[in-house]
Regions:
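N-terminal glycine-/serine-/threonine-rich beta1-alpha1-beta2 phosphate-ribose binding loop
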Residues: 1-122
Length: 122
């Protein structure tokens, strides 16, 4: 019997990415962008922000981080690419935003489960 080389971390990351996509509150047409909020913008979140412009049909509309200094720095840095970006310090407010279609949870591990549950409920 062979063992899979899938680590717990990779499994959880893939699962969280799939579950974090919110159900759309509007019908998306063929030309509609997916509006994304990135929660946690220090390291992994910054990497996601740098790569979203390479994905057609994806637009970052909001960023969230508990550290207001990092939040302001990232928002200023990436508004040149994405246009106006709303800033949040509480991820619960992001989940309530009506124009966010998907969220990226680039947060510490202990926030993954609760953040994913809130995203699915939104």
């Amino acid at each position: 019997m062979t063992q899979l080389s899938l680590s717990r971390r990779n499994f959880l990351a893939a699962s969280a990415a799939g579950l974090a996509i919110r159900p759309w509150s509007r019908v998306l047409g063929a030309n509609s962008d997916i509006r994304v909020a990135v929660i946690g913008v220090r390291n992994i979140g910054k990497t996601h922000l740098m790569n979203f412009p390479k994905i057609p049909g994806v637009r970052v509309v909001a960023v969230c981080d508990i550290d207001s200094d990092v939040l302001g720095q990232r928002a200023t840095e990436f508004e040149k690419q994405f246009g106006a970006i709303r800033k949040y310090t509480d991820l619960r407010e992001v989940m309530d935003a009506p124009d966010v279609d998907a969220v990226v949870l680039a947060v510490p591990n202990h926030w993954h489960a609760l953040g994913t549950i809130w995203a699915c409920q939104a």
